[in-house]
Amino acid sequence: MKKTIIYTAFWLATAGIALTSCEDIFGGFLDKQPSNELTEEEVFSQWTTTREFHFDTYNFLRHGACRINNSWMDAATDLAETSYASGGTRTSFNIGNYYASGAATELTGTWEHYYRGIRKCNMLLKNIDDVPKATDDSEEAHATYVKQYKAEAHFLRAYFYWEMFLRYGPVPLVTDVLDPDGDLLSNYTTRPSLKEYVVDFILKELKDCEEGLMDKATSAESGNPGRISQPMARALYSRVMLYMASDRFRSESGISWQQAADAAQSFMTDYGTLYGLYTTDTDPKTCYTNAIL
């Protein structure tokens, strides 16, 4: 019995020393952020991480290739039919009967997806003016990059809100970086009107950002041919105007068919020569790239 007490006391003392030593050695290790994650301050402390953060926002753009259970978006129209898909989505798409349900992640998961992208845009717009320039960049080049990134963030945010509108109608417009531990609800208890959401915000964002974006040639030569360019802003502006002039939205938006036609004509006048249904080029890579872009 005496030996048991001695052994127990010994191991308790050893454990106490070990715990104390761990605390002395590692400090508040368990309370620290994972080493592979950067804080907001760290991201925007240098241009390299700021650039990576900004380009990552492009990942929130979606495409029609196999997006919904391996089905193509064209199969939801009269243009095509999906021959392979899982979960019964093929049939639903082909007969135009795809609807919101617990499994319809395209509809249910889009809310979080786009608000995450919107938050990244807000974070960039909040911080980028204070990011130091890269060592190899001149002051003039840095100012150009900042202007382009801000314009791209405004475009992406407008695009994300437009995609949300197509699924949910007007949703809360968040243009600040919300504090997860702060008041998240009091300023977003009412749904904005269609005019406030689309006309006063989305269309204004698209119109204002166009001047700061790259032109199409510069975008193609930048090494990132998918970068947002001026024609993209004007094209989306025209698309939104077309929706707003429709019978469904005209009474609330105040936009007429003539205004929508003028927006489309503006795109064709300024950018129409840059695009075509068929173009020729001696470089197969360029032909394929142009077919997509």
Regions found by a protein language model. Name each.
Residues 235-240, 245:
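Amphipathic alpha-helical repeat scaffolds of TPR domains
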Residues 1-34:
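Bacterial Sec-dependent N-terminal signal peptides
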Residues 47-48, 55-64, 87-168, 189-200, ...:
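Conserved, well-structured interaction surfaces
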Residues 22-23, 58, 83, 114-117, ...:
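Long, intrinsically disordered, low-complexity segments
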Residues 68-87, 137-139, 171-177, 214-232, ...:
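Short, surface-exposed recognition loops and adjoining beta-strand edges that mediate ligand/DNA contacts
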Residues 184-197, 249-252, 256:
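Structural transition elements
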Residues 22-77, 149, 196:
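Acidic, glycine-rich segments characteristic of secretory precursors and extracytoplasmic regions
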